Every structure is written in C-alpha cells, then in structure tokens.
A protein has these predicted regions:
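A generic "binding-loop/recognition-motif" signal
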Residues: 54, 157, 197
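A short helix-loop
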Residues: 2-45, 51-52, 59, 69-70, ...
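Catalytic cores of large soluble enzymes that bind and process phosphate-bearing ligands
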Residues: 90-97, 131-135, 150-153, 213-220, ...
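Predominant activation on well-ordered alpha-helical scaffold segments within soluble catalytic domains
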Residues: 95, 99-103, 137-144, 162, ...
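Glycine-rich phosphate-binding loop and adjoining helix at the ATP-binding site
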Residues: 117-175
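Short, acidic/turn-prone active-site loops that include or flank metal/cofactor-
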Residues: 72-76, 156-158, 216-218
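N-terminal beta-alpha supersecondary unit
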Residues: 28, 40-117, 123-127, 134
C-alpha cells in the first residue's frame, strides 16, 4: 500500500542504511553469531519481528522453516479514511501493539524462557517506513539485551524472495495455490517481487546472492492499484488490489 502525508525520502529507509537504524544499542549479529546460528539444530527457535509498514507481526520459526506460531495486528481500520498508510499513525499503532503481539506469539509457541528457548531474534530493518521499522528494531534490541541472544537484520524484499523455500503448508493461506505443494524452490531460481513499492525480477543464486534482471521504470503495480482505487473512491485500507474486483460494489458516478 502507498503512504500518505510525507515524501518517500522522509519516510522510507533502504537496507543500505540499516547501520544507521541499528546503531543505538543491542547485540547484533557478529561473525561468531553467524557461525553459531549455522550450527544450530533444525528445530531451534528463531523469533521474527516485522513492523516495516502497517502490520505489527511476530512469529516463532524453526531453523528448518517450520512456522511454530505467529501473531499479527492489522491497521486497516486506522488508515482507511486517509486512503493510504499515514506513517505517524502507523508508528503509534506499532508502539501500542508490539509488546502484546510478541507476547502472544511466544505464548502460542509455549516459550516461557526466551534466553533458553529462543536462539536469535530476526527483525526487518528495511526497506520500509523508518519510523515504523524503528519500533520493531527497538523491541528486538530490548529482547536481545535482556536475554543475550543475537539480532539477525532482515532485508524485507530478501525475505519475500526466500519464502519460496518454505513449504506451502506453512503459509496458512487460502489465496495462494501451488502446483507442487511439497516442493520448495531450489537455488538458483527466478523470483518476481510485486508489491506496493517494488516490481523486481531477480535471479536468486543463494542467500545474499541476487542479480536484478529487470524492474519497473515508474510506479510499482501495487501503487498503481492503490491510486486507481483511490480515484474510484474505493476502500484502500487493505490495499487497492482487493478493493477492485467486486462485482457487487457500486462505483460512484
């Protein structure tokens, strides 16, 4: 979904700037941490935190990719009347929700001792709305500092690419159909990222190894959907795409 109220340069932070957003404390992933994480058993718990835009989300995922638990708070009702995500309102909603979302996620996974049961905390550091990203990063820093577990910075778009390596049954989605449900993408593969901010075709050769084959020269498709829905006075709180294909909807004249 597109943002409202401030310019992209003020709101968005790319992964190249992640050192700036991560520079105010916390136990961050070092080379020793990387080696330790690689040697973890397949059933080791990783806590993931996501606050890049207008959803506050957390999940416990095993090293093998099994989703043990997840919790999410949507902000659709907050942004509906504005026709897009308002960064300041999104940040405030994240601040209100983040503690309860993480607590719910840990409870569902029966985690009672983070320091003993969770091996790392992964958190989105960009791209996204900088003021929203900081809410998630600071929560991750707090957990890391209190329990002595490393932080793994996550690139938002890289995560979208690599979800193709998670088995379909883990997605828990009725809107996605896959021909071979028990297969996952094997390196190398081609990934198409289509969202409100990005349209990119990539060759994925491994984790951290990507080649851009092509990308949009202007607006992303998701942004075009949002703008069109807004012009048609359709609700865009959940995105312009879902708002459109409804034959029962009466369009304004």
């Amino acid at each position: 979904m597109t943002t409202r109220g401030t310019s992209e340069s003020e709101d968005e932070i790319g992964v190249k700037d992640k050192k700036a957003i991560l520079s105010d404390g916390g136990v961050f992933e070092t080379e020793d941490d990387k080696l330790r994480l690689k040697s973890l058993p397949e059933n080791a718990f990783i806590l993931g935190i996501e606050t890049s835009c207008d959803d506050t989300a957390a999940a416990i995922v095993t090293k093998s990719g099994h989703v043990v638990s997840q919790a999410i708070r949507s902000q659709v009702s907050i942004h509906e009347e504005w026709g897009g995500v308002v960064p300041t309102l999104a940040k405030e909603a994240h601040q209100i929700a983040i503690d309860d979302v993480v607590k719910e996620c840990l409870s569902k996974a029966k985690v009672t001792d983070i320091g003993r049961q969770v091996s790392a905390v992964a958190v989105t550091v960009g791209p996204g709305l900088s003021m929203c990203l900081r809410v998630g990063v600071r929560k991750a820093q707090k957990i890391s500092g209190e329990h002595g577990i490393p932080i793994v910075p996550v690139h938002h778009m890289e995560a979208h690419c690599l979800v193709a390596r998670v088995k379909e049954e883990e997605w828990n989605s009725e809107s996605v159909e896959i021909a071979n449900k028990n297969e996952v993408a094997k390196f190398p593969f081609v990934a198409l990222l289509v969202s409100g901010g990005h349209n990119v075709l990539l060759k994925v050769e491994g984790v951290g190894k990507y080649t851009i084959l092509g990308q949009t020269l202007d607006d992303a498709i998701g942004e075009a959907y949002d703008k069109t829905a807004r012009l048609l006075c359709l609700p865009v709180g959940g995105g312009g795409g879902p708002a459109g294909p409804n034959p029962r909807r009466q369009l304004p004249v």
